[in-house]
Curated annotation (Swiss-Prot):
Function field: Catalyzes the cleavage of thioester bonds from S-palmitoyl-CoA or S-palmitoyl-N-acetylcysteamine (unbranched structures) but does not have activity against palmitoylcysteine or palmitoylated proteins, branched structures or bulky head groups. Conversely, hydrolyzes both long and short chain fatty acyl-CoA substrate.
PANTHER family, sorted: LYSOSOMAL THIOESTERASE PPT2, PALMITOYL-PROTEIN THIOESTERASE/DOLICHYLDIPHOSPHATASE 1
Annotated family: Belongs to the palmitoyl-protein thioesterase family.
Annotated TM spans: none
EC number: 3.1.2.2
Name the UniProt record assigns to this protein: Lysosomal thioesterase PPT2 homolog
Length: 288
């Protein structure tokens, strides 16, 4: 009887260890005007309910430094993901929140040989941003309709926001001056266009999370690559060139069953990574 009990305990211990080892490491990138500490609730939930998970809570470009040029940030995030990936050849999961999701996506695209298995974009402006509520968090005296005068300039492009400010009624200026979003979305062809697409289609899973009550990402459908047209009507991503022309591989991922779109109502932008029920419903299913 004593031997059987010892064997049972050993089996349960081995089972627990194997489950822990099964969870892939998770890299988390914070949003704008915040830092790694803002993602602490999410880290605690992962560590409590997925014990043994290695979590890398990236602390680069905290606070006002998060307003630095987007490519400068992407370069460091790319190197960070590359180093973490080398430590875990079995593959990693990357979760980027808000601006962090956009920077993380660009970093992944810049690593065509990455080993990111799942990328979770948590309420991130993947198709750009155009809205007063977001703008006034950072530039209180700037109006959305005239923000292009700042952002579509050499000075404006030194800010991260300028890199993904997408004025639907100033598309000529957006394509002419913006040095970030049109490139990673392959709206402007460059020598990196092919590798940017390769970085995306290399993913096993792309999870896009957002919702209609976000109140910061504008339009909220940008979290799923949807966006305004020149008449300010929101066009869903499946009707936009980024999907129909498969410019960065989103259509390829969808056809392979690797694209997951999550729409969650009644969640404010600041709650996606802090509300326990939201974390468990929209994030945990994709942490394997």
């Amino acid at each position: 009887m004593r031997l059987r009990l010892q064997v049972l305990v050993a089996l349960l211990t081995c089972s627990s260890i194997s489950v822990s080892l099964a969870y892939k490491p998770v890299v988390i990138l914070h949003g704008i005007l915040s830092g790694a500490e803002s993602m602490a609730s999410l880290v605690r939930e992962i560590e409590e309910f997925h014990p043994g998970t290695i979590v890398y809570n990236c602390d680069k470009f905290n606070g006002w430094y998060s307003l630095e040029n987007a490519w400068r940030q992407v370069d460091q995030v790319r190197d960070y993901l590359n180093e973490v990936g080398k430590l875990h050849p079995e593959g990693i999961i990357v979760l980027g929140y808000s601006q962090g999701g956009l920077l993380a996506r660009a970093a992944i695209q810049s690593l065509p040989e990455h080993n990111v298995k799942t990328f979770i974009s948590l309420s991130s402006p993947q198709a750009g941003q155009y809205g007063t509520s977001f703008l006034h968090l950072i530039f209180p005296d700037l109006a959305a309709k005239t923000a292009f005068e700042l952002f579509y300039s050499r000075v404006g492009q030194h800010t991260s926001v300028g890199g993904y400010w997408n004025d639907p009624q100033r598309q000529d200026l957006y394509l002419k001056y913006s040095e970030f979003l049109p490139l990673i979305n392959n709206e402007k062809k460059t020598s990196n266009s092919t590798s940017f697409k390769m970085g995306m289609v290399r993913l096993n899973k792309l999870v896009m999370i957002g919702g209609p009550n976000d109140d910061v990402i504008t339009p909220w459908q940008s979290s799923h690559f949807g966006y305004f047209d020149e008449n300010m009507d929101v066009i869903p991503f499946i009707r936009r060139p980024i999907f129909t022309s498969d410019s960065i591989g989103i259509r390829t991922l969808q056809e392979a069953g690797k694209l997951i779109i999550v729409v969650k109502p009644h969640v404010h932008h600041l709650a996606w990574h802090t509300r326990r029920d939201v974390i468990h419903e929209v994030i945990f299913p994709y942490l394997d």
